Regions:
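Compact, glycine-rich, soluble single-domain proteins
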Residues: 4-87
């Protein structure tokens, strides 16, 4: 069982994140979703809100303006309408 997975977050302007992480939480259409290593395949819409991930450098928070997420083969790809690091 893997203890990390790859997180990639993109906006139309740039790549925000490309990192190995231990866990991600984000605002899904029907509530908060959590993703851990070896998560089942998933495609979901994301609501505007906070995406939080835990990696080597600790906990990181991003504000996303909605979008979509796909989880497959220990890679989570997020296509966000907009995004920036949380203050």
């Amino acid at each position: 069982m893997a203890d990390r997975f790859r997180l990639r977050v993109y906006t139309p302007e740039r790549e925000l994140v490309d990192a190995e992480v231990r866990e991600v939480t984000a605002e899904g259409t029907w509530g908060q979703i959590g993703v851990l290593p070896d998560h089942a395949a998933l495609v979901t819409a994301l609501e505007p809100g906070e995406l939080v991930y835990r990696g080597e450098g600790g906990v990181v928070r991003l504000h996303l303006g909605g979008g979509f997420a796909e989880v497959r083969d220990n890679v989570m790809t997020v296509l966000a309408d907009s995004g920036e690091p949380a203050s």
